[in-house]
Amino acid sequence: MKFTKIATPEQIDQKWVLIDAEGKTFGRIITEVATLLRGKNKPCFTPNIDCGDYVVVVNASKAKFNGLGKIANKEYFSYSGYFGSVKSTKMTELLEKNPEKLYKLATRGMLPKTKLGAKMIKKLKIYASAEHPHSAQLAK
């Protein structure tokens, strides 16, 4: 009889991965990022342990968007809890002003809604241009 091996935090090797978003489709980038952050591409994947990699996304503002007007119609809502305080932001506005936030919101929707998911999203580094301060980590 075979048993499933459960990985321990000491056995997990977390690497740094660089993704260039220029010319790629937004949804496919986010799917790849969520898979890497979660660690589902590794043979030692364990759902209750953070075994994902650190992900650096560059050229975030140069990604392609497909779909029938999704970028123009999609809205993100924020609500503080007070009456009448629902704020909505269109996807186009978010892409122009703060593409980093757009990527974080989309990726967060694909990760677990737990403390582990919050820990995973902290390992995502997004930059609108090609420059980033993580060249030392990526060189390893």
Curated annotation (Swiss-Prot):
PANTHER family: LARGE RIBOSOMAL SUBUNIT PROTEIN UL13M, RIBOSOMAL PROTEIN L13. GO terms for biological process: negative regulation of translation; translation. This protein is one of the early assembly proteins of the 50S ribosomal subunit, although it is not seen to bind rRNA by itself. It is important during the early stages of 50S assembly. Pfam families: Ribosomal_L13. The lineage of its organism: Bacteria, Pseudomonadati, Campylobacterota, Epsilonproteobacteria, Campylobacterales. The keyword Ribonucleoprotein applies. CDD domains: Ribosomal_L13. The keyword Magnesium does not apply. One of its GO terms (molecular function) is structural constituent of ribosome. It comes from the Bacteria. InterPro entries: Ribosomal_uL13, Ribosomal_uL13_bac-type, Ribosomal_uL13_sf. It comes from Sulfurimonas denitrificans (strain ATCC 33889 / DSM 1251) (Thiomicrospira denitrificans (strain ATCC 33889 / DSM 1251)). Keywords: Ribonucleoprotein, Ribosomal protein. Belongs to the universal ribosomal protein uL13 family. Part of the 50S ribosomal subunit. The gene is rplM. One of its GO terms (cellular component) is cytosolic large ribosomal subunit. This is Large ribosomal subunit protein uL13.
